[in-house]
Swiss-Prot record:
MF (Gene Ontology): ammonium channel activity
Chief subcellular location: membrane
Keyword Transmembrane helix appears in the UniProt entry: yes
Name of the featured protein: Putative ammonium transporter 1
Biological classification of the source: Eukaryota, Metazoa, Ecdysozoa, Nematoda, Chromadorea
Record's subcellular location: Membrane
Family under the similarity heading: Belongs to the ammonia transporter channel (TC 1.A.11.2) family.
The keyword Transmembrane helix is annotated on this UniProt entry: yes
Alphabetized PROSITE patterns for the sequence: AMMONIUM_TRANSP
Record-level GO BP terms: ammonium homeostasis; ammonium transmembrane transport
Record key words, sorted: Ammonia transport, Membrane, Transmembrane, Transmembrane helix, Transport
InterPro entries: Ammonium/urea_transptr, Ammonium_transpt, Ammonium_transpt_CS, NH4_transpt_AmtB-like_dom
Cysteines engaged in disulfide bonds, as pairs: none
TM helices/strands, residue ranges: 31-51, 69-89, 115-135, 139-159, 184-204, 223-243, 263-283, 291-311, 318-338, 346-366, 401-421
Amino acid sequence: MTTPTNFTTEIDKLHAEITRLETGFYENVNSFFLCSMALIIFFMQCGFAYLEAGAVRSKNTTNILIKNLLDSCICIIGYWAIGWALAYGDSGEGVNLFVGHSQFFLSGFSDYPRFFFQYVFSATAATIVSGAVAERCEFITYVTYCTVISTFIYPVLTHWGWTENGWMAKGITSGIIDTKYDDFAGSGLVHLCGGSISFLAAWIMGPRIGKFPDDEDDESDEILGHSVPFTALGGFILMFGFLAFNGGSVASISHAGDGHTVALAMINTILSGAFAALIYLGVHYYQHGKWTLLLTINACLSGMVAACAGCNKMEPWACIWVGLGAGLIYLAFSKLMIRLKIDDPLDAFAVHAGGGFWGLMSSSIISHGGVAYALADAVSGAKNSGDHLTQAFAQLGWQMICALAIIAWSLGVMLPIFWILKKTGKLRVSEEVEINGLDVFKHGEMAYPLRAYGHGWHDFERANKIQAFSAKITVGEGKNTRIMKIHPEMSIEQLASVYDRSGNIIPMPKKSRTLFTNSAERKMSQMMYDENKM
């Protein structure tokens, strides 16, 4: 016979088992949510790859793609070994405001979903810079700044702003004032950081050859990318990724209200991007009479960047102002870069630094408890409206201080590194390599080798003729000299100079012969012309 005591014990055991299963279930659900969002954010690397590949000339496509590949590889190793420890490792009392110093190589740490989610954020911050230095950056420079950002710059910033011990997160508490750094999904810590470094890198590296030929001209010669479809596809992938970037920053899905916050963040993100795109498109059409696709994509991304800071607590109507501000700031910063004669092929500074800075400010202006709400309370004569106004402006001021700290830290660390690379001749490729393209010289792999294309019965015969025109050339100087066997391949730009719009082969005018870099290419062009006349 079961006694009351035994029955109570069994009930307690059953309750404990149910609690254990419930806790485990919630942990698994949250882990799955974080990993799922992180996978989508990781796919943003593909978006950056397409966006940047389409925006560069065909002769540099392989170069930009391998940089995007290695971004993921370098960042995971650096963040695993050092970055996580500096960002979220336990801190001693003396340095806890500025940096963590434990859990290197994830020693003693097992919250892998959280680590994976933060890693993809780190990779995003690092990959932003590659667009600003495209088509002229030495490979060692890319590896260097990618490593420094993922292992040092970004982790320290996240410790400042996203840990309870960080000085930005602690803020200032004095009387009625209680400020804390407000950046839900990284407008400042990810995008303002990456955008600021993009500005520095593009400035120190200098413009691409031919970008600003006339020092007296405030405009620039447009250097066209080779694939609008690639750029558009990359933009769509990034738009998709931003929904997970911001929605996933809730970091859980099992608590009451989590699903609502995730949905709100995603809705605000796409709304901000939409308003930014439309305001920019309208202004651009008014100024130039053209409905631009490429720049509208950038404006949309700028709006999504701006939404990162306050998307979890803004009302959807507020996205009108977030998006409009982001679109106009992108327009202003893009024109400023041209006026300063700083060549940023992907507008990385305008998109990420401009959008990121506005995001930090707007989260303290039009989010709940922001300046706009405090002013409305003051006008309506609400109780304690004066205190609310003081708190709102104090929070806005703290956001400004934190934004300047992010810029100062990012530039302060990278400036001496870029300076050393420039002084040692490792910052930028030679003029010869830049003019002829990085793909062949640096990687030995053309993105679009003409020998890979075939559409007729005479391809084999023509391939044999082309092979006969192969030549050896010497590239580089001193210890960097290389003797390379060059087949008469041409970039897409050079091929376009041979064909007219109807697809017929036309004679080469004298002034365009400079497009061909060796005698083999000239021979091939002449051969194609001679065959066409038969």
